[in-house]
Design a protein with these regions (language model features):
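N-terminal secretory signal peptides that target proteins for export/translocation
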Residues: 1-5
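Zymogen propeptides/activation segments of proteases
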Residues: 26-114, 379-380, 408-429, 434-438
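Beta/coil-rich, acidic/histidine-enriched accessory regions frequently appended to metallopeptidases
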Residues: 282-460
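Acidic/His/Gly-enriched intrinsically disordered linker/tail segments
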Residues: 154-163, 186-190, 205-270, 276-322
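Bacterial N-terminal signal peptides
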Residues: 9-19
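Active-site microenvironments that recognize anionic phosphate/pyrophosphate groups
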Residues: 22
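Juxtacatalytic substrate-recognition/specificity segment
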Residues: 64-209, 216, 227-229, 241, ...
Length: 460
């Protein structure tokens, strides 16, 4: 779901991972489910997104693999102008035809070029068999659109299915008055790319964590419409939420698209699709860290924690070095603190899958050495990152040490005078859990607020 960052609240939960299931799951299921949504043509819808009048006479309009639904009166009606009506005589508004063209382009990239699996068929729901239904609705400022699974997909007495079919609901005009600072066509394009990605995700595993669902959907926006760069507004917020874990189901998950960008730069674009295709077969079910871990290992990489430590190191100077495809457009990541010049240790408390960037002052000497101690058993990393030259055209030199079981770590950079900036990166890369919390809709991670001690000194 694409949410307007100016209006945060309950809508930030990913509708893509809401179940088409009763409000309370069977004992033993790891998920807590909310009341399922209904198509606008079905009544009533708990979110109050039902149409208040019948569909327009020519609705739905279908082309290729999509059907677009609309009404002809009331607040939910799109602009009904049909300037080419004399030519085609179809009675379909130009806006609806524009949505169908956008849909065809999105499908050509996501399913064609990138090779993602076709959506799960919804049968005859909404119109023609097997087509993805798109409903135009007055959504307003709270959200740009959403994808939702259909109700009634739970066979009686059986466990919850992991592969589901669903539908899209998009705004009926993306008026600049309601979405200030954006452009209507661009909003339609990136929202369709994002929400349709959720539909595809549902046919891999509808119950992966929201952070994976949203971050990969934002990543998909930029694959389909690279020139719009709408995702950068999420990145600008992401850099300030350094205490929020990468795996958190929170507003930060949209900006976590940078994790996917980093993986793609390292392993190629197929790794994102591969993480989804492996999701159904990883354990515990629905644990997205395991899905990424499986794809990374299959691509020749190391474990998730090691890769996260490398990612954290590379974020320190992501505007340099070319490790992020559009890194020069990213904001500089704020340093959270400075290490004392006299070598006194600094104490930090880090949540799982978080890191802190610390300024290191080393104007001279043969080398600079950083030391850190992580709690025993906690996967952790320590890096020194030095930038030579300016932040957009400079060169980066780094040293990283990853300890899967915690303990003492030491890294060293030679000739510190050559660097414009030196940063120590302290990483809590641990992802161990103890079950799933039905109340919080998140895993019970075991290593939050883990104490670290770090220091740095120059070698004369």
């Amino acid at each position: 779901m694409r949410a307007n960052l100016r209006l945060v609240g309950p809508l930030l939960a990913s509708i893509a991972v809401l179940a088409a299931a009763p409000a309370v799951a069977r004992a033993g299921d790891q998920w807590a489910f909310r009341q399922p949504l209904a198509r606008p043509t079905d009544h009533p819808d708990p979110a109050r997104h039902s149409y208040t009048v019948p569909e327009a006479p020519h609705s739905p309009a279908c082309s290729g693999r999509f059907c677009v639904h609309w009404v002809a009166e009331g607040l939910d009606a799109p602009d009904l102008a049909d300037e080419n009506g004399v030519e085609d005589g179809d009675g379909v508004p130009d806006y609806v035809e524009r949505v169908l063209k956008v849909a065809a382009h999105v499908h050509a990239i996501e399913n064609g070029k990138l090779g993602w699996r076709e959506p799960r068929s919804d049968g005859h729901r909404g119109g023609l068999e097997g087509k993805t239904d798109v409903y135009l609705k007055e959504l307003g400022q709270q959200l740009f659109g959403y994808a939702a699974p259909d109700r009634g997909q739970i066979p009686k007495g059986l466990r919850l299915p992991r592969r589901l079919h669903g539908y899209l609901v998009l705004d009926n005009d993306y008026s600049p008055f309601q979405y200030p600072g954006t452009k209507p066509l661009a909003d339609l394009e990136v929202t369709f790319a994002h929400e349709y990605c959720h539909i595809l995700q549902m046919n891999y595993d509808a119950y992966q964590d929201a952070w994976m669902a949203e971050s990969t959907a934002v990543w998909m926006e930029d694959q389909v419409y690279n020139g719009i760069n709408d995702y950068l507004r999420y990145v600008r917020r992401w850099v300030h939420l350094y205490n929020t874990p990468l795996t958190a189901n929170s507003i930060r998950e949209y900006g976590t698209t940078v994790w996917n960008e980093w993986l793609v730069r390292r392993y190629g674009r197929d790794i994102i699709r591969d993480a989804w295709s492996r999701a159904l077969h990883t354990r515990p079910g629905g644990f997205s860290v395991a899905s990424y871990d499986s794809a990374i290992r299959a691509a020749g990489g190391s474990e998730f924690g090691d890769e996260f430590a490398r990612f954290a190191r590379d974020v320190a100077e992501w505007r340099s070095g070319g490790l992020f495809r559009e890194g020069r457009r990213y904001p500089d990541v704020p340093r959270q603190n400075s290490l004392p010049r006299d070598g006194e240790p600094l104490r930090l408390w880090l949540n799982h899958t978080t890191f802190q960037l610390l300024r290191v002052h080393a104007p001279g000497g043969r080398a600079v050495i950083a030391r850190a101690v992580a709690p025993r058993g906690v996967a952790a990393g320590l890096a020194l990152v030095g930038r030579i030259g300016d932040e957009r055209r400079g060169r980066v030199v780094s040293r990283l040490l990853f300890r899967p079981h915690g303990g003492a770590m030491t890294v060293r950079l030679a000739q510190p005078r050559r660097f414009e900036r030196i940063t120590a990166v302290v990483v809590n890369a641990d992802t161990r859990t103890e079950g799933f919390s039905a109340r919080r809709l998140d895993w019970n991670y075991l290593t939050d607020i883990a104490p670290f001690r770090v220091e740095a000194r120059a070698v004369r």
